[in-house]
Amino acid sequence: MKITTMSVVASGVVLGILSIGVTLPSKADVEELASIDNAAIAKNRETGNDWPAHGFDDAGTRFSPLEQINDSNVNGLNLEWSYSLASTRGVEATPIVVDGVMYVTAPWSVVHAIDAHTGEKLWVYDPKVPRSYAEKGCCDVVNRGVAVYEGKVFVGSFDGRLIALNAQSGEQVWEVDTLIDHSRPYTITGAPRVFNGKVIIGNGGAEYGVRGYITAYDADTGEEAWRWFTVPGDPSEPFENEAMAMAAETWDPSGRYWEAGGGGTVWHSMVFDPELNLMYVGTGNGSPWAHRLRSPGGGDNLFLASIVALNPDTGEYVWHYQQTPGDNWDYTSAQDIILADIMYEGEKRKVLLHAPKNGFFFVIDRETGDFLSAENFVPVNWATGYDQDGRPIETHEARSEDTPFDAIPGPFGGHNWHAMSYSKDTGLAYFPAQHVPVSLQQAGSWSYEEVDFGQPMSGTGWNVGMYINPIPPSEQPFGRLLAWDPIAQEEIWRYEHTSPWNGGTLVTAGNLVFQGTADARFMAFNATTGEKLWEAPLGTGAIAAPVTYEADGRQFVSIAVGWGGVYGLFQRGSERSIPGTVYTFSLDGEAQFPEFTKHQLDALVSGVDYNPEDIEAGTALYVSHCAFCHGVPGINRGGNIPNLGYSNAAIIEHLEQFVLGGPLIERGMPDFTGRLTEREINQIKAFILGTADAIRPASND
């Protein structure tokens, strides 16, 4: 493992910052930054002055005790300041606020330090991720934020590095390569966590054929402390530990699962209970998605789609609970985990609360891993419920190997990574629920890294073993905000949004729930009743979660916005647009909103000659190389990547000039040289143009 260590202060950097008139943190501020550790994060739960951890606290509650802004005065909230992130891709970051400084990440893992009082830029750090790396990620070049600990800011870069920065100056302190195999397309989009002096980071990539793991590094030096794999490797080699030997018993080696990695990546949720000295991680989907292709003899395939408890000091396995045994639908368990103490059947229990992709809300004993209850929070058709042992009661058709299954929820999940919050005052969890219709059919044949024209994005490395939407889904999409009672396992109230892919939530002691929406609004609700109390325009869809903090006796509410993520690549929720932006609101704010622009959607493309006989071949090529970013020509409106059905005719006529040679690599578009021929590009053109002609309204002439 190579660690690159940098000097803590570079005079040139400091002079450069001073030359643009920015005030650096004072000595007292630096001491405050240096004191941020898990004990300080726990203490902040009482005051709420800062937002020092990804989920506000190490339990991930996203509940602030601040109540200066409350259900009786929130309608007076106004913009205090805005800050441009100068980005055009998805913004998924939860800002961290410590002693008057906000740290927030933009696409491509760029870190911004902002004066939390005024919105002035303090410093910016760009890890210089190669833009060609974009095609190695399933779900946009996003980053969900940083960790701050003892004077350092930690960020995971999209290309797999963990980087420590000086919190005062933004200068790099150390950098470590976290990837075990550079021939595999691992990415990092999640925020690091720091528990007991160790920086914990996972990764993503299960759609492409990787083996999941998390790694802990010494926060001071960057030295590796431990690594824990989530799925077993080649059984002909010694297993790393007893947990991997146990897990291997649940996989069929005849499928040679290790060649495709197996999946199980820890790409998002990690929380920590200092009293039990346990950390909890949520693991991802299988690689490939299709259960019978990766493990022909069946089996639960541990530790896919599971909650796993580990010792944060050693990485030793303690317990697990698998929510979706033998995952077959991309039902990751990487969504937000919240630790809470509740009365359950007349007894005070330490539990964890979880609403993963599979559509069920779980309550699990966090001391033992025992299953307590599960109830669906959205319609589901893959299972009718869970038995008393905590296993799903599956429907027969959900695992059909020869007919399409209209999965409800689909792979976008009944709830995805968008933040969930929990109020100790109301006893309710608040989270964005959704459904994006998708039908799935197992591929007839499959092998790792084989390009299967018609299998989604296999031409760019996808490895799912499924055809997506071989028949049109029967369901309609929806998005809603839910308030859920985890004890009664029932919905208390809901607010229906105009589309899926809405932002995460914040709940406060002021009896308020805040949420940004796909249709570019920032909203506040009465946490008890669900009544909408306030909203403000954002200029672009919001997918990240808001935070709140106090400075100079005033409470602020902030949200970082920027439409994107996997759904936002090809679909949009708002006709307004603005670069990535941080907005901060207060009760006496007087700032003006930045100017919003309106999407300009051209007419369906026409005027380019094509051979109709090429449409069938072009359809399969488009699905395997283009569809997940550009959507269906003329059907999806385009997200932060344009829909080709509405392109200028000259672009489609000369499509090979954009597809070959890599002229758009700096925007994240792959170079398809050697992967597509000019003949195949002409077939893709035929599909785009033929689809546009097929859906074009008839002329009145």
Model-derived regions, located:
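The canonical Cys-X-X-Cys-His
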Residues: G618-P633, L655, V659, M669, ...
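Electrostatic cytochrome c docking/interface patches
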Residues: I36-A39, T597-L621
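Blade-level signature of beta-propeller repeat domains, shared across WD40, Kelch, NHL, RCC1
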Residues: V547-H599
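Gly/Gly-Pro-rich "capping" loops immediately C-terminal to redox-active cysteine motifs
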Residues: G631-L664
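C-terminal capping alpha-helices of c-type cytochrome domains
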Residues: G156, E653, T673-D701
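Blade/loop signatures of beta-propeller domains
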Residues: D29-L79, P235-A245, R391-T395, N469-I471, ...
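Extracytoplasmic beta-rich repeat domains
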Residues: Y83-T94, V124-A147, E175-A191, F229-S269, ...
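Repeat-blade elements of multi-bladed beta-propeller folds
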Residues: W51-G55, G90-V110, E135-R161, P185-R211, ...
